[in-house]
């Protein structure tokens, strides 16, 4: 099975669109390294401290806990 030039372009663009749709950080690249452990959400969750952020992250998955970092809610993996 051969990969056409058109399919290769679609595949590469898909990788970039998916990786830039996640929380951005200051490191260039695909962003896959840090995104497995962290997801950013609205800064409104951090108005009253970490509690709203933590509740939101725990509801998403029991393996996350919420932490407000630079006024943004981050869901961090408990195992990392």
UniProtKB/Swiss-Prot annotation:
Localization per record: Secreted
GO cellular component, one term: extracellular region
Annotated signal peptide: 1-23
GO terms classed as biological process: defense response to fungus; killing of cells of another organism
Alphabetic keyword roster: Antimicrobial, Disulfide bond, Fungicide, Plant defense, Secreted, Signal
Disulfide linkage: 40-75, 46-68, 53-73
Coiled coil: none
Family classification: Belongs to the DEFL family.
Entry protein name: Defensin-like protein 113
Source organism of this protein record: Arabidopsis thaliana (Mouse-ear cress)
């Amino acid at each position: 099975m051969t990969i056409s030039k058109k399919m290769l372009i679609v595949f590469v663009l898909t990788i970039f669109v998916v990786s830039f749709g996640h929380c951005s950080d200051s490191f260039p690249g695909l962003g896959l390294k840090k995104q497995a452990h962290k997801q950013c959400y609205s800064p409104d969750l951090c108005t009253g401290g970490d509690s709203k952020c933590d509740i939101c992250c725990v509801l998403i998955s029991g393996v996350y806990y919420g932490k407000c970092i630079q006024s943004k809610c981050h869901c961090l993996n408990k195992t990392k």
